[in-house]
Amino acid sequence: MASVALLRSFRRREVQMASVSAFKSVSANGKNSMFGKLGYLARPFCSRPVGNDVIGIDLGTTNSCVSVMEGKTARVIENAEGSRTTPSVVAMNQKGELLVGTPAKRQAVTNPTNTIFGSKRLIGRRFDDPQTQKEMKMVPYKIVKAPNGDAWVEANGQKFSPSQIGANVLTKMKETAEAYLGKSINKAVVTVPAYFNDAQRQATKDAGKIAGLDVQRIINEPTAAALSYGMNNKEGVIAVFDLGGGTFDVSILEISSGVFEVKATNGDTFLGGEDFDNTLLEYLVNEFKRSDNIDLTKDNLALQRLREAAEKAKIELSSTTQTEINLPFITADASGAKHLNITLTRSKFEGLVGKLIERTRSPCQNCLKDAGVTIKEVDEVLLVGGMTRVPKVQEIVSEIFGKSPCKGVNPDEAVAMGAAIQGGILRGDVKDLLLLDVVPLSLGIETLGAVFTKLIPRNTTIPTKKSQVFSTAADNQMQVGIKVLQGEREMAADNKVLGEFDLVGIPPAPRGMPQIEVTFDIDANGITTVSAKDKATGKEQNITIRSSGGLSDDEINRMVKEAELNAQKDQEKKQLIDLRNSADTTIYSVEKSLSEYREKIPAEIASEIETAVSDLRTAMAGEDVEDIKAKVEAANKAVSKIGEHMSKGSGSSGSDGSSGEGTSGTEQTPEAEFEEASGSRK
């Protein structure tokens, strides 16, 4: 964007230097003026060569970030707005236009019900999940039940899966990288919270597919941060404390001779900055209700303003001990307008969110226990995620691990950089590094008595494959149902159901006689395939775990087509914007020339130019590309008559057609300031 702005500033300066030769150029070849040279606008604006770069994307709950390897270093790429992180916000405005990132976040106050944020917390979740029900009470937009039972969102009357919302953000990250690299990108490494279950990982991969990305690897966020930290030959046992916008993860890793081995991981997929914001929001609502006896929860507009103020106050209190929350005209009643003005101290804030911060303690202790590592054996503690900037969080981390945390990595960027490094490893650009990750939760099946039988314990290094033989529970049983579960509870009903399938055609036999071999195969992305095989007949059935309830292949393909259609609409929109900008430049230069030479040209020429400019302005207000092109050309032809008139030596002819003092044949023709819309000068 900066380069575009710079280019436009140069074009404006050229307007002031254009000479009468520009008029001669137009009049000599009218057909090739303006749109003969702007034919590129009729083509898609992105016709870049396809590159084989693998970008790294941190798809965050609150913000997202994209990085790419430059040589041996990962570089974070700035977006079109010049920021290194992009809000994970998607909105549908009243015109039905899709907004992503900063533009979407800016309009949230006036369009709260159609602005989707924090959708990562819904990805791969069922509508009847208790966490989904909790989230429904905290957000202004609608969370609805999809036909397959998943939690979806609604904006402008349209229903979207969380994978689609994530895909819009991934597309924004993809376009950011393409603009920087100057070539098309279709490969990426995408990060997820370490404690994401299989369904959530699959849903994230689906989001990548919808965005037109071949997701080469799904990598855990703490592991990615450790890669970023350990690139410079650092070794030892490290703990990664990752408290982001929506999720909390902690991982213990050992780095030795370029091998990054995850010992254990733990976390909470519903603990993050959003919860801190909601707690503070609830406090502010209650304070205003106490002082003014008005419940702001019934006013979506006021609530969104308050939500943004709460987030801003939270950020400010990381660097100051007190902040003012001042929102004039927050609402009104019969007595008039009401203003909110509350002073919030850091100690009060810490008191409000104390229980949330304490919730990070238990996962850390469990992770240390699972890894078989003592506090003294941890060499370094890395802080990742924006919430780790909160002083109280840093204080708790010091208490848990018995040492001050390292602040050597950027908490907002380390994850994306680590993902880019993993992309470099997959491409072969980064050598002598090996990443050994783990499965965060135990996997198994339901067996007789509704018991959860684990085949793969949590923190098993992946990729991995394990088989176990089971049998029938009844005589002459000809089919068995395989219910795939993930979790740590003993009873099947208390764990997450990932999928179900049947193995049929088992020969009749007494109970306990048939041998059914169940195999779990987990790939490097942490995505599971389960198969069941009757060893007697060789019959086999398998299932690759989809997101809970799942997007079918047909649904994913439909969403891919919708995304492509949106991309086409975006191209057409950009074409129209570029065209309007060029037309605006033409109007500027034409009016400037007319202003300077009005007294030296006949009235009919001046009138023709004014009419052409007026027609062009009218066309610009519409969306007909061809009409704008035609009106620009008409304006160019009209203004070219100034040059024709001046070149005939009429000199200072007035608007009434009479001559003034005249000019000698040897006198230099005055310069007229005009520029072709293509920006070239002859």
Swiss-Prot record:
PANTHER family per UniProt:
HEAT SHOCK PROTEIN 70KDA
Tell me yes or no: is Metal-binding among this UniProt entry's keywords: no
- Quaternary data: Interacts with HSCB.
| Compartments, record wording | Mitochondrion; Cytoplasm, Cytosol
Any Gene Ontology CC annotation: plasma membrane
Job description of the protein: Chaperone involved in the maturation of iron-sulfur [Fe-S] cluster-containing proteins. Has a low intrinsic ATPase activity which is markedly stimulated by HSCB and ISU1. In cooperation with other chaperones, Hsp70s are key components that facilitate folding of de novo synthesized proteins, assist translocation of precursor proteins into organelles, and are responsible for degradation of damaged protein under stress conditions.
Name the record gives this protein: Heat shock 70 kDa protein 9, mitochondrial
In which domain of life is the source organism classified?
Eukaryota
Q: Where is the composition biased (Gly residues)?
A: 651-663
Q: Where is the transit peptide?
A: 1-46
Q: Which UniProt keywords apply?
A: ATP-binding, Chaperone, Cytoplasm, Mitochondrion, Nucleotide-binding, Stress response, Transit peptide
The cross-references to InterPro entries, in alphabetical order and at most eight, read: ATPase_NBD, Chaperone_DnaK, Heat_shock_70_CS, HSP70_C_sf, HSP70_peptide-bd_sf, Hsp_70_fam
Family to which this protein belongs:
Belongs to the heat shock protein 70 (TC 1.A.33) family. DnaK subfamily.
Instruction: State one molecular function term (GO).
Output: ATP-dependent protein folding chaperone
Q: Where is this region: Disordered?
A: 640-682
